[in-house]
Amino acid sequence: MHSVRYSAYGLCLESNLPLQGLAPCGRTEVPDLLIEIEDGERFPAAPTETAYYVSDWRDQGSGDAGLKIYKLTDASYILRYAEGVEFHIAADSTRIAARFASHSSLVDMTSFLTGPVLGFVLRMRGVIALHACAIDVGDKAIVLVGDAFAGKSTTAVMFARLGCGVMSEDVAPLCLEGRAVAVRPGCTEVALRPSAVKYLYGSADALPKFSDNWEKRRLDLAATGAFSHRTLPIAAVYVLTNHGTAPDAPCVRPLSSGAAMVELLANIYANRLFHRELRLRELDTVHRVVETIPVKEAVTGGWSSPVERFCEVVLDDVRAS
């Protein structure tokens, strides 16, 4: 079988198997990362080394830690998920060996690969990415920062329904272009909770599941023409907060430079991988963002306020800036 090339987060990926949720990469481009997906029948035992990182969140079925990361003696990393998916990332971050157990699937593996695993690879390469969605608003992008329950995916889909392009729903890699700070596009799919699908489309079954092992629903942005593949300078960064009782929500509020630094540093993607050089690069990049780009608090109002109205408030703020 011929290898397949894809583009995501500024990287050209070459995989030995087709993967969903990724935009194609030209055959003339040199791959930055080779992905070898191995037979699920050979899923290995856990490494004997002490885990470098153990997640606080637990698998509902087994009660085991959802993610364990091992750093091997050759400086490579193994990311092992309780769902039966494992990734061995080479020390130079140019190769990934991916495996999944018989009770898992290629689709399950891909959902981890295209989000947290590639986010980890970016981190290994010294690329600073935010836990954020990125939206194409014309000749520039806006970045909406927030944790896993901030509503980034739902908000991204609503922006798409208002005619904007979605560049990424969860990982927003930053790049410095002269004095400007830009954001690169990521994957072509959005993962939505059933409650969000019901809110947006009237029924939780309006979109298909990613797989039988995962409750989240899959929205293919490329199929609907809502994916933006452009790298764009950032017009503004919005830190999402859900103050349902705020009388003026949805609204946009200014943040001091100090508060902006704290919020952005707290939302650096894959910050479990840490060393001094990376920390210095983080500080430099975040300082550049705060120095050159408006960083504001965006109060959504939670589910008590229509998401469409929140998106309109943000777009009005972008136009007024």
What kind of feature is each model-predicted range?
Residues M1-S104, E312-S321:
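Long, basic/Gly/Ser/Thr-rich N-terminal segments
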Residues H2-D32, C133, V137-D147, R161-S321:
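Glycine-rich, often acidic-flanked micro-motifs
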Residues R80-A141:
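Extreme N-terminal, non-catalytic leader segments
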Residues T155-A156:
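Post-Walker A alpha-helix
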Residues D39-G40, W57-G61, I96-A98, H103-V107, ...:
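A broad, low-specificity signal for short, low-complexity segments enriched in glycine/proline
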Residues K152:
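Conserved lysine of the Walker
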